[in-house]
């Protein structure tokens, strides 16, 4: 593509290019874990999806679960023990695991043993070893395991990946991205498990940093081979009696063929997020790609030419559930599968090791 044709980059590109056939029916979901994200984002997204419906809620709080069951017309409410015992397995086809990170493996493996497909929140687990066990359990059971990454279904991000592959910005040289989100709960409350390293597996890096990390891998179509990182530990006292986690993480990733990426994640700075791909001939900038409900703002430049695009707002969480259900109903292998989650955790572990040792670590 030359500079004169760059304006055609966003002409009539499909918003759901992953959907190449019709999907009949709806996937009945059991939602395991009813924390803030499940209540505020996931359950409303499932309600807005044309291919999903929630039939079962799993929680340690019966009162909360019953209230939400009434709100979202869920037929069954069970405890975690009841879910493990398989009390209402006939009521759902797939399981959405939205528990704190340390419990992802446990409930994914329970679901696989029940023969249910799994959409598991990111990060897939708190360690590579656990994540690999989850992948093996689902493969042995013959069920789908999708890591709940939203960016693979966001139309503008998918289009930017196509433009990079098509060489619109030349050869990709560098990806930079950041995700800063000030945690609204700065107190050491029970619901603030993200500040407990034994439950979260880390802090800002494993919670927010996986977004620019995973999106860089997605756009480049490659895995990092080396990592260098620094972290700043939370000293605010918000962690309470928990082990302190990093409030900020800055990392650099080396990819094959001399390509690299830099990323930043933060719990304690002004909330903002960006992703930029620099190539030998131009660049692509995505404004606010990680926010959940996004404006699809993209700027593409090549030489002296420049074009911009702003689509209709997209709820990435709705797109994520729609995509997962489509994959289950059509037998399609999801692109952010379990092994994708393992690859990110392998990089995250290298990032943490590098920050601790103060030197580059091979991934």
List where the protein language model places each region.
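C-terminal helix-rich "cap/oligomerization" subdomain common to oxidoreductases
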Residues: 1-22, 58, 63, 69-75, ...
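Glycine-rich Rossmann-fold phosphate-binding loop(s) that bind the pyrophosphate
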Residues: 34-35
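A short, Lys/Arg-enriched amphipathic alpha-helix followed by its capping loop at the start of a domain
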Residues: 44-52
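Beta-strand-loop-alpha-helix segment that lines the small-molecule cofactor/substrate pocket
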Residues: 94, 100-101, 105-150
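Predominantly a Rossmann-like dinucleotide-binding segment in NAD(P)-dependent oxidoreductases
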Residues: 151-238, 358
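NAD(P)-dinucleotide binding in Rossmann-like oxidoreductases
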Residues: 240-246, 254-319
